UniProtKB/Swiss-Prot annotation:
Alphabetized NCBIfam families for the sequence: Orn_aminotrans (TIGR01885), PRK04073.1 (NF003145)
Keywords: Amino-acid biosynthesis, Aminotransferase, Cytoplasm, Proline biosynthesis, Pyridoxal phosphate, Transferase
Keyword NADP tagged: no
The organism of origin for this protein: Bacillus anthracis
Name the record gives this protein: Ornithine aminotransferase
Any GO BP: L-proline biosynthetic process
EC number: 2.6.1.13
Gene: rocD
An annotated Gene Ontology molecular function: pyridoxal phosphate binding
The protein's required cofactors: pyridoxal 5'-phosphate
Amino acid sequence: MIQTKDIIELTDTYGANNYHPLPIVISKAEGVWVEDPEGNRYMDLLSAYSAVNQGHRHPKIINALIDQANRVTLTSRAFHSDQLGPWYEKVAKLTNKEMVLPMNTGAEAVETAIKTARRWAYDVKKVEANRAEIIVCEDNFHGRTMGAVSMSSNEEYKRGFGPMLPGIIVIPYGDLEALKAAITPNTAAFILEPIQGEAGINIPPAGFLKEALEVCKKENVLFVADEIQTGLGRTGKVFACDWDNVTPDMYILGKALGGGVFPISCAAANRDILGVFEPGSHGSTFGGNPLACAVSIAALEVLEEEKLTERSLQLGEKLVGQLKEIDNPMITEVRGKGLFIGIELNEPARPYCEQLKAAGLLCKETHENVIRIAPPLVISEEDLEWAFQKIKAVLS
């Protein structure tokens, strides 16, 4: 049997050096548990950046995959498939939007939102050609494609990739006055994460989302919520925007939309926004393919049937409370909503993630000094308590 060190050696030899993973190879997974080739078990506290909210290899989702794979997997968008229509309806009703545009990865859905906002600005708002602007927040993470990188405030993400997309205005996260000051007659959209994930589980001030939406409505600016990581139960609400009772003009969804089994993403908005497209103006050969749609329908049903959103809220509140009781001056803050939790340290978090790995827990540092805790939402209370005791031992 091939061993962990052999796999890592192959990866280092032939793989582009664009990731810095923990030195572990996962060869098997089920629920909240994963195994390496040697049979060592670990609890997954990352959930593939919230793509595995329903747990690894959920039986209902896997059965949907197998059933659809035995019938048809890809039609392209040149033809209709029997899965796309039902999937459209499922997502439209979930988001309470009239239209859905399917893609594959989260970054593709972000690019879709950028194109939508710009075209809406020209066709509907009547912004002068090639002058549309998009407002984003500092420390955002919307992906790695050129549009997403152009919106980043992290210069390392941009280094060597210029020129960037023009018309991007960056403001401090959660700063309402900065948003007001940044809006011009050319502003097409305000795109933000309702809770910033890669920034270290950064939660905006209470009421900010609602106030920002009101400003956008007053100024005729689209309010676009990137819920790729935060959506679909992760924060203890179906969407993180729900914490402020906010319904954005457009949702960007991905990750858990595919149940940790098959990539699928989308933008969802009403007809007056997504209706700006005509055939040929945007698309994807694999976007909305029947295999992805069948998997996604099952993934959304699992969230509903197993009440994973409510579970995230209940377990998350308990875990945040426990983590806040750990007595160590190295911990500067514990923050989170649902099972989307950040433990901020006053020193680099990577060594502690490596210690947690040795203790049987897999998590990843983010924003240098934050340990992100985001297990699959199917985790049992007993398993979460076991994880807490391990975390407490390492951080005490």
